[in-house]
Amino acid sequence: MAFLHNGNHTAVTEFILLGLTDDPVFRVILFTIILCIYLVTVSGNLSTILLIRVSSQLHHPMYFFLSHLASVDIGYSSSVTPNMLANFLVEKNTISYLGCTIQLSLAAFCGTVECFLLATMAYDRFMAICSPLLYSTKMSTQVCIQLIVGSYIGGFLNASSFTLFFLSFLFCGPNRINHFYCDFAPLVALSCSDVSVSEVVTSFFSGSVTMITMLVIAISYTYILITILKMRSTEGRHKAFSTCTSHLTAVTLFYGTITFIYVMPKSSFSTDQNKVVSVFYMVVIPMLNPLIYSLRNNEIKDALKRHLGKKIFS
């Protein structure tokens, strides 16, 4: 049963997710592709976390933040992918009210924390390249923990705003969500209660998080670029660039897709395009991050070679 009647209001017990496609053949193809992506995402990010834990040469702030980014990427992908995979195998894609609440909360939490972590990692690179003599003091263990805790608190507060407003919504049915997961925008469109305040507040919080973190990243890399251009040593320039390119690649991919969905006018792209971009930043990017950081970072590659060599020759 999808509805429970209580007086003049209708209490929803489940939603119908319209998903990515109705074509049964395409559903099987998508199931196979996304399952492979999810397995690579979990194994790749877990490998990154374990490698950083066991490699003493990676016990630095940059890799401490990277291990948390890998954890968040697993959570981000897991917030939508398992349910999406299950729905590919059934005709009627449903999700319970509680499941929708959890999915919305976890996706908002992980997405917000990822923004803060990417900004924190940019600040870390700024301190390492622009103020190397003060780096060990400015990026002490205590400071790193405070930055991580602050990122998670920020994620919790932003996710709470989405969750609380969603719980206050009234739905008159039919509760068909034109998406593959419980995103806030289609839920707002379904609600038959006044959503004006919720739209303004959640847009303000999300916009503030996005703009502040992008500003921190932009300022950090502006100073980094100026410092690198002033370096006389070619080797020093190359090393500085190599430590920043992987992070810049991850930042460009993540914020590029967020800008497409949340900044561009809604009339400029269709709902189907929105779904495709959502798949990219919630499913594909969490898989790409460990590949980007491992392939473009010599310290991670060296640590991986050392541990693989120990396993092979032990």
Swiss-Prot record:
Known glycosylation sites: 8
Extracellular side of membrane: 1-28, 79-102, 158-199, 262-274
Compartments (UniProt record): Cell membrane
One MF annotation (Gene Ontology) recorded for this entry: G protein-coupled receptor activity
Coiled coil: none
Record keywords: Cell membrane, Disulfide bond, G-protein coupled receptor, Glycoprotein, Membrane, Olfaction, Receptor, Sensory transduction, Transducer, Transmembrane, Transmembrane helix
PROSITE patterns cross-referenced by the UniProt entry: G_PROTEIN_RECEP_F1_1, G_PROTEIN_RECEP_F1_2
Parts of the chain on the Cytoplasmic side: 50-57, 124-136, 221-240, 296-314
PANTHER family according to UniProt: OLFACTORY RECEPTOR
Record-stated family: Belongs to the G-protein coupled receptor 1 family.
Protein's UniProt name: Olfactory receptor 5P68
Organism, as annotated: Mus musculus (Mouse)
